[in-house]
């Protein structure tokens, strides 16, 4: 298996989505000093994304809430989509989640509103190159720390990726053979979206009409 180098890559934010932040494993070990952990809301999907692109330690990825951002790639990078089903696309070609893809200079990464789940993760080989604070790049917007200037991404932001070498197998989004990977195993689709949620009515139930409670259930 050939080893490939990925250097001087970045992406420009064309559209930021509803709320897209840089997250890693979280800022662990500083809560006694009042430092929030931050980190991914869906740790499992984040971790799977890291593994897919060959990152052996937690590094910065994009956490996308409800609506996918649109990103224009500069250089060459490896990317994987995990978590919520936002129908990710590369150059308007829909690609499955849970598979690493190679993106080239000028490629456009995008998607739609989530069809299932709330947060999708876009992981990059090497990770997102932003300053660490207390050993983490996780964004905490209320404290305005971490990530890209301590805030969600906005249009025209240009975000660098760390240089890396990889010897993992990646797919080209244009090849028909990618459909071989579009299975339950590789495209697991996150968690089941139709699981029942059990509710115990409390004292606040009297504040709702019978019709409202019926519609909720």
What are these regions (language model features)?
Residues 1-217:
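Conserved "landmark" site that anchors the functional core of diverse proteins
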